[in-house]
Amino acid sequence: MGVTGISTFPCCGKDSVDIVERQSDHHRHHHHHTHEENEDEDTEVEAELPRTEPPPKVDPELGPVPQLEEMEPELPSKTTPETEGDSYTESPEQQNYRMESLKPYEEEEMGGRYRSIPVQTSKHLFWSNKLIQASEHSLQKALEKHHRSPQEKSISISQVYTECTQPPSSPPVSRPTTPTAIGLADLINFASSLAVASSSNMALPNLENMIKGTSEKSQNTSLDFCQPVQAIKFAQATQITQISSEKQDESPKSMAHKSWTRETRNVACSYLDINQAGLKTATIQGEVKFVQTPIASPQLQEAKEDSVPGTKKGNPLLLKIHFKLSSPQPQRND
């Protein structure tokens, strides 16, 4: 029992160990050989399978990459050319339409505000100031056609833009191509008178005092209360028709020619204060169009006692004032 060593266990000798190792090596070689044969058989089976049926799972390194690349260009070919054209042109057309519709709207907001004032009345006849005048050639024709004495220089609404009194003594600025300008004060006074006349809040005598004025006194009247800085270019409408004055034979005494007072001037200009700094530098471009309505029956044309001379009920005067007020941009002091 006390002897120890390799010889004590004959089964664990060198020869036996070598034999065991050789057997294990032989077993390993044999197992490796059979494994290689199995792999060869598997590859042969896999090579035969694609001929009959595609494999359910394909190696990702071989199959999917070329198949996806080939299928991508085939997808658009399934769609018809009509759907391709619709999908290609819908989005750009919508974008262009939106850009075109929003762009002028933004320019209008930045450039100024457009206002249109339609007025209709059948009871009032408006009288204009001497400074409201038409273009030079229209003025000459109006003076030749409707020649009046200096005492009857007050003109009706039918002659607001076709006839006026004598021009000021100072030589006007020569503008051969463009018509003469209409002042901002004149347009405001005229529009204010129309606004007052269209409402029933003010009595007719006061309205008559506001709108009427003699030419002799109006020449000496100062307009510093609404002196314009920028003139308004008047575009004379071709559709304007002259309304014949039905009471030219009436004596001038029946027409109350009264000059403008400071009170009435302030009321006329109260609708838009031109003395403000912003409006003094603003640019206003406007156009006034008169439309003559069809003549009604003689029974409806009988004048009322409370109406201003020169108009008859049933034959209203229609006009449209369209103007644009542009505020100047602030100047930068660089």
From Swiss-Prot:
Keywords: Phosphoprotein
Source taxon at top rank: Eukaryota
Keyword Membrane: no
Keyword Chaperone attributed: no
Biased composition (Basic and acidic residues): 48-60
Region (Disordered): 24-98
Pfam families: VAD1-2
Tissue: Highly expressed in the testis and weakly in the brain and heart.
Record's compositionally biased regions (Acidic residues): 37-47
Modified residues (Phosphoserine): S135, S138
GO BP: spermatogenesis
Listed InterPro entries: SPATA32
Segments of skewed composition (Polar residues): 77-98
Assembly and interaction partners: Interacts with syntaxin-1 and ACTB.
Name this protein carries in UniProt: Spermatogenesis-associated protein 32
Organism field: Mus musculus (Mouse)
Gene expressing this chain: Spata32
